[in-house]
A protein has these predicted regions:
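Short alpha-helical scaffolding segments that buttress acidic/His motifs in well-ordered protein cores
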Residues: 46-51, 81-82, 97-105, 133-144
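Acidic/His metal-coordination segments adjacent to aromatic residues that form catalytic metal sites
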Residues: 83-90
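Short acidic alpha-helix initiation/capping motifs at coil-to-helix transition points
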Residues: 21-27, 56-60, 107-115
Length: 164
């Protein structure tokens, strides 16, 4: 049951009306993360899934992208999310994005100071892609924790609509 309002279990956006200006801005930010992101979809989805599990956000864990299958995002990507360090089905870029997401959600200042990590990142990410990854992770950590804390949408599955 939602901690604010009387929203249906599958209503992920109705609560924005409680704060229309900020909620609307957040909706715009979310839209940009999913429609303007330059990260490869597998890389983005693995990072998102890592944070979803860290946040213990049910709807976030259950979210899928309608464009995913065409981009090589299958259920195996999600099934092995806890094995991002070792599962051979992830590319090095995907693994680095997962590491960034995990550490962003749990140890952000240690991540900032890890020169080895940033050297490895420079081999697989441009500054522009790192900016997209960081901003995306900011959305996912914040929104996932808000949804979980306020118990909003925790009984549903979300499919991100196709952009094609």
């Amino acid at each position: 049951m939602s901690r604010i309002g009387t929203f249906a279990d599958d209503d992920l956006a109705g609560w924005f009306a409680k704060s229309p200006d900020i909620g609307g801005a957040l909706g715009g930010f979310s839209q940009a993360v999913y429609t303007k992101n330059r990260l490869p979809l597998r890389t983005r989805e693995l990072a998102r899934a890592v944070i979803a599990h860290r946040n213990e956000c049910v709807v976030c864990v259950n979210t899928r992208d309608e464009d995913g299958p065409a981009a090589g995002v299958d259920e195996e990507l999600y099934e092995h999310v806890h094995e991002w360090r070792t599962w051979p089905g992830y590319s090095e870029q995907e693994r680095l994005a997962a590491e960034f997401a995990d550490r962003f959600a749990t140890a952000h200042t240690a991540l900032r100071d890890d020169e080895d990590f940033w050297s490895r990142c420079a081999e697989h990410f441009s500054d522009e892609l790192l900016a997209d990854l960081a901003l995306s992770c900011a959305l996912w950590v914040g929104m996932g924790r808000v949804l979980r804390t306020l118990d909003i949408g925790q009984a549903c599955k979300l499919t991100i609509p196709s952009r094609g």
